[in-house]
Amino acid sequence: MANFSESKSMMAVFFMFFLLLLSSSSSSSSSSPILKKIFIESPSYAPNAFTFDSTDKGFYTSVQDGRVIKYEGPNSGFTDFAYASPFWNKAFCENSTDPEKRPLCGRTYDISYDYKNSQMYIVDGHYHLCVVGKEGGYATQLATSVQGVPFKWLYAVTVDQRTGIVYFTDVSSIHDDSPEGVEEIMNTSDRTGRLMKYDPSTKETTLLLKELHVPGGAEISADGSFVVVAEFLSNRIVKYWLEGPKKGSAEFLVTIPNPGNIKRNSDGHFWVSSSEELDGGQHGRVVSRGIKFDGFGNILQVIPLPPPYEGEHFEQIQEHDGLLYIGSLFHSSVGILVYDDHDNKGNSYVSS
């Protein structure tokens, strides 16, 4: 387990200077135009996270009422796939946006597909770390605490496709995802977040990092040598080493304004949602960007989000087959951006 000091404020100044350079650059490698916006209406509110199975026929997303749903094309639309809560029922939970119902219905914040074993890992704010098979249904709960400290608000999850080991974050060890909990996290600048791993072969959960500053994202590298973790309130990404001479240690990687969830693309690079808070924090102005960076901390691309995501917090930006999937807590549709000249024939299930 590792701890580390905060980065220098000059890194934030450098980042903002770098953004100005990107915005004025004509290089397509740093700033690609949005060619098309696609919106797929969800049967429930706030589709915020995505994953894809090995068939590559559609996608999965988690929604506000506690479900994980699957989209299989414009003809089939969405179908229910999984529930983290064993108590989820249609009459009480379906399409609910009431936070008071989350303890019963659940609220999934991230999902990650294990291709080798054809199963999906789920992190839920109330039912914690779960797994469900390829047929879906009610998920099996795997872990609820680490070192005797219960999880309060699991938020990000990723699977090492080589080993099957699961890495996930807890936003806070004290406060949950209730409106009151969120307010306390922000007001106290909570630093009790954690990074954990779960080994399905031993069924053991291990604490890797603690005292994180609202860790809203985590993703493993393509070679499995490190995990990158986003600290929302520290405006930074840190790298935790899993292999090599630095194994078990963490280090500052790159400054990102208010980073959210992180997802790796097929090139081994990382996309992170950035909802930069201006004018006094969460009730002020927000600058919404998708930012791509590499494992060395180099910023490769910055994409200002178009309406309706412009100027608001968003949860996730994930690249798949040349499309960018946008996860948000404030809309009832899945936003998909075509941002370059990739051939998207493999994604014919997406209706345009």
Curated annotation (Swiss-Prot):
Database matches in InterPro entries: 6-blade_b-propeller_TolB-like, Strictosidine_synth_cons-reg
Subcellular localization(s) per the UniProt record: Vacuole
- Glycosylation: which residues? N95, N187
List this protein's GO terms for biological process. alkaloid metabolic process
| SUPFAM superfamilies assigned | Calcium-dependent phosphotriesterase (SSF63829)
What is a GO molecular function of this protein? Answer: strictosidine synthase activity
May I have one GO cellular component term?
vacuole
Top EC group: hydrolase
What keywords were assigned to this record? Alkaloid metabolism, Glycoprotein, Hydrolase, Signal, Vacuole
Q: Which residues form the signal peptide?
A: 1-31
Catalysis performed (reactions): 3alpha(S)-strictosidine + H2O = secologanin + tryptamine
| Record Pfam families | Str_synth
Q: So, what pathway does this thing act in?
A: Alkaloid biosynthesis; 3alpha(S)-strictosidine biosynthesis; 3alpha(S)-strictosidine from secologanin and tryptamine: step 1/1
Positions in coiled-coil regions: none
Function of this protein? Answer: Catalyzes the stereospecific condensation of tryptamine with secologanin to form strictosidine, the key intermediate of indole alkaloid biosynthesis.
Give the UniProt family note.
Answer: Belongs to the strictosidine synthase family.
> What is the name listed in the Swiss-Prot or TrEMBL entry for this protein?
Strictosidine synthase
